[in-house]
Amino acid sequence: MTVASPALIRIAAALLIDSEGRTLLVRKRGTQAFMQPGGKIDEGESARAALARELHEELGLRVHPDAPAHLGRFQAVAANEPGCQVQAELFRVDSDEQPRAAAEIEALAWVSADETHDMVLAPLTRDVILPLYRDLLSAPR
């Protein structure tokens, strides 16, 4: 008997960091888990272009597709799609521009590395991105 692999959802996500070293987490309407801003990569679209599009649609931020630093490709259980995995192209975006919740975003939260213990977090955010964020903040410059 073969076991079907979970469906894979390709996304672009932003580790958005402000000048105070906080990162932005978002929660989509009708969901419980906070996660990085970003979204699905459309057919034929680059991860960078998808990130710029999603940041503009969801938060009103204008980011040139070449500006974010690519941090890697990561995979985890999807927070809002049962039986699916997300594969994220993660980019660091440094910005002090004030985001505003738009499209499907219901809540925004600027958090420091140690402020997330009481939040419901997406598996990718909790298990991969926030530990990476903490490492980035503690790395010597």
Where are these regions (language model features)?
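Active-site-adjacent beta-strand/loop module that shapes the phosphate/pyrophosphate-binding cleft
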Residues: 74-100, 132
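NUDIX/MutT-family hydrolases
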Residues: 90-92, 100-132
